[in-house]
Amino acid sequence: MKDLISIIDVKDHVGETVKIGAWVADKSGKGKLQFLQLRDGTAFFQAVVFKPNMIEKFGEEEGTAKFDEIKHLSQETSVYVTGVVKEDSRSKFGYELDVTELEVIGHSHDYPITPKEHGVEFLLDNRHLWLRSKRQMAMMQVRNAIIYASYDFFAKNGFIKFDSPILSGNAAENTTELFETDYFGNPAFLSQSGQLYLEAGAMALGRVFDFGPVFRAEKSKTRRHLTEFWMMDAEYPFVTHDESLDIQEAYVKALIQGVLDNAAYALETLERDTSMLQKYIDTPFKRVSYDDAIDLLQAHENDEDTDYEHVEHGDDFGSPHETWISNYYGVPTFIVNYPASFKAFYMKPVPGNPERVLCADLLAPEGYGEIIGGSERETDYDLLLKKIADFGLDPKDYDWYLELRKFGSVPHAGFGLGLERMVTFVAGTEHIREAIPFPRMINRIQP
């Protein structure tokens, strides 16, 4: 309806009569007053109904009947509400609505998620309704702000959107984590990453990025893992590893700034410490080599406040190691030049040290772990062919990818950012399941 306004816009209509389409999230009151907590997807907002005002407008009989109807509104009833916008310093939102008229659109009966504590599994079983809560709405607004900030960053920095396929005949990362499906009698796999295809795009179009769902058949039940999640991949030619880190740092800072600018109310709802987010924007990220990080972990492994296991050079980090490192530095931290033995086949070796590769993981502080993985790519055809074979992969599956090295290969690099991990970090929430509308985990594929 053209005459409706959104709750988020009521600040521009103080003293005016407005009409809002909303749902009744909660209700309280006594005697001649009723307080309605309304939501419309943009914000939550209190509407106040005063019985004498209803009687004055509609007469004794009709006004009383309308007030009684409002008293008995059930949770999640949809309504059109008309009233005068007033400033309210007691409200976090800062405004309230003095109701003059209310029309019920759709009734709600026996809404399962009542205003009380519920178990996580119950809430996930009712995820289609849990999304209506104040916290979950805020999470989706943070997610939305990050997505829009991503598109804005890439547009301003000369990137072209390049869509990679969801179905693929080969693996980009770990073949043990593939979801396999039948493709007209032949095996196909759900995409783990659009990166290989982005390399083709970069050789044709220059700076490219991709944004879409990816799938990992990891049997992990941690707070950081989903089997289906969204990945923002970027690839760029004529860029070295160190230059790539500069781009990644600028990108992450732009995402945080985008949320501060466009989802401040959501961060307030989530009680996120925005001074920490501002610190991450204002402070240069740390860059630490893998071997220096191992030395640091070994030096502090007997400290009273450490809870990670001993690691040797050549070992991969676990979540406790990542958490400790990022908290030690207090800002997002790049760990660079990991061992080639547990990194992807397409990564370029460190010059003079083939046991290490030109790659980096960006670890978020406050215990959020890796949010970006990136590397400079191998450009030599023969070396890449050997790496594919060494990883036990069939070179025939990568014929097209290898050909990129035969026809004008250039230095190039790129990275992938896990959207849900970034949302979890910026929002300051504990579990990744709240960072996506309908989480897919090892034990959940419904609703």
Curated annotation (Swiss-Prot):
A GO cellular-component term linked to this record: cytoplasm
Its EC number(s): 6.1.1.22
Segments forming a coiled coil: none
Biological process (GO), any one: asparaginyl-tRNA aminoacylation
Reaction equations catalysed: tRNA(Asn) + L-asparagine + ATP = L-asparaginyl-tRNA(Asn) + AMP + diphosphate + H(+)
The entry's keywords: Aminoacyl-tRNA synthetase, ATP-binding, Cytoplasm, Ligase, Nucleotide-binding, Protein biosynthesis
Domain of life: Bacteria
GO MF annotation terms: asparagine-tRNA ligase activity; ATP binding; catalytic activity, acting on a protein; nucleic acid binding; transferase activity
Class of the enzyme per the UniProt entry, highest EC level: ligase
Keyword Protein biosynthesis: yes
SUPFAM superfamilies reported for this sequence: Class II aaRS and biotin synthetases, Nucleic acid-binding proteins
InterPro entries: Aa-tRNA-synt_II (IPR004364), aa-tRNA-synth_II (IPR006195), aa-tRNA-synth_II/BPL/LPL (IPR045864), Asn-tRNA-ligase (IPR004522), Asp/Asn-tRNA-synth_IIb (IPR002312), NA-bd_OB-fold (IPR012340), NA-bd_OB_tRNA (IPR004365)
Subcellular location: Cytoplasm
Oligomer and partners: Homodimer.
Family under the similarity heading: Belongs to the class-II aminoacyl-tRNA synthetase family.
Entry protein name: Asparagine--tRNA ligase
